[in-house]
Amino acid sequence: MSWYSKIYVAVREYRAKHKITGWILTRCLNVLLFIQLILLWWSLYMYVTVTIGYYVQSTIQATIYLIVGSFLFVMSMWSLAKTLFTRVGRVPERYRPSKELEDRLKAVTPMEKNRYVVEKSTPEQLAQQNTILEEMCTYCKVVVAECDQVGRLKYCYECGHIKPDRARHCSSCGKCCIKYDHHCPWINMCVTHVNYKYFLLYIIYTSFLVYWYLLTSLEGAVRYFINQQWTDELGKFLFYLFSFIVGGVFGYYPLGELIIFHYQLISLNETTVEQTKPALLRFDNAADYNMGKYNNFQSVFGWGLWLCPIDSSTQDGLHFDIRYVNTQQRNRFVRIEEEPSSTQSSQSSIQ
């Protein structure tokens, strides 16, 4: 568990006992988000009033700077808003088995310190658990390709449902999310299938915004030393210098490194948690979700408008194409396309 996950768990436990102060403490978890917003808006103000309004002499040059800077700022804020206000993808109710099946599974799973510990199961218990989990899938009319570290179908004892492929339980939120990437303390929410594209666009546009500020602000630093108005321009220059340093730091870390890191993840069609703990697929331990770089990027950014923070996804976050190393298993899982609201349940079948 990461350091910030421990903080989230502690706050969640505190809120369960102290409603009012716990609610206030929960709101305080947004401090990193507020710091980002303050820095971005303050940087925009300094850029417009000092860089463009004072140091840039050419009207045409100032207009170009203002248009490009404003565009990047608007796209950054739009992407952030979509990231924050898009509902986090939770596991659908159809993955929840009956109470009888749930009780049977828990009865054959060892418990330690009020937690179900699958790793402590005997071979006989594992066999019983897997049989019950198969019954759960039949009951829920779903098919999953992934298994856990002991070879069972994946089940969340805390949330009480079968885990769809690539779903994970977020220890920070205390709930399962579909195609879970990570819980980001910078925005105080989970990054999942539904908002991953917006999150990536936010760090991309914010990075370009910072780099644009830094590049076009160099002229102001040069003019300060050319003008030699050391006292009159000192206040502007100090604020200017502070913005330059903050922009340079955030442009490298976390923004710059995050772009490189997530580019590598998407190229392999992995999530952050899968990079540290790869998904295990039944029937072929070497199988993965890597369908080629273009298809991998399309699975995240959709059919078109990759650079626009609107929904263009071609996937539902529950079913994914699988690249099998063993070609005999290539068509093991075939998805049946059906609307969840149709008379027949949305499901997959095994050939």
UniProtKB/Swiss-Prot annotation:
Taxonomy, superkingdom: Eukaryota
GO biological process terms held by the UniProt record: amoeboid sperm motility; membrane fusion; nuclear migration; positive regulation of cell size; protein targeting to membrane; pseudopodium organization; spermatid development
Record's keyword annotation contains Lipoprotein: yes
Catalytic activity as recorded in UniProt: L-cysteinyl-[protein] + hexadecanoyl-CoA = S-hexadecanoyl-L-cysteinyl-[protein] + CoA
Keyword tags: Acyltransferase, Differentiation, Lipoprotein, Membrane, Palmitate, Spermatogenesis, Transferase, Transmembrane, Transmembrane helix
Major localisation: membrane
Pfam families: DHHC
Domain DHHC: 154-204
Ranges in a coiled coil: none
Enzyme nomenclature, EC number: 2.3.1.225
Keyword Cytoplasm: no
Tissue: Expressed during spermatogenesis in budding and budded spermatids.
Phenotype reported upon loss of the gene: Self-sterile phenotype which is slightly temperature sensitive. In hermaphrodites the temperature sensitivity is restricted to the larval stage 4 when spermatogenesis takes place. Premature disassembly of FB-MO before or while spermatids are budding from spermatocytes. FB remain in spermatocytes whereas MO localize to spermatids but often fail to fuse with plasma membrane. Resulting spermatids are usually smaller than normal and contain several or mislocalized nuclei. Fewer spermatozoa are generated and those that are have abnormally short pseudopods and are immotile.
GO molecular function, one term: protein-cysteine S-palmitoyltransferase activity
CC per GO annotation: endoplasmic reticulum; Golgi apparatus; membrane
Comment on protein domains: The DHHC domain is required for palmitoyltransferase activity.
Role of this protein: Involved in spermatogenesis, specifically in the morphogenesis of fibrous body-membranous organelles (FB-MO), which are Golgi-derived organelles used for transporting sperm-specific components, in spermatocytes and in their localization into budding spermatids. Required for the proper formation of spermatids and spermatozoa.
Name by which UniProt lists this protein: Palmitoyltransferase spe-10
Organism of origin: Caenorhabditis elegans
Gene transcribed to yield this protein: spe-10
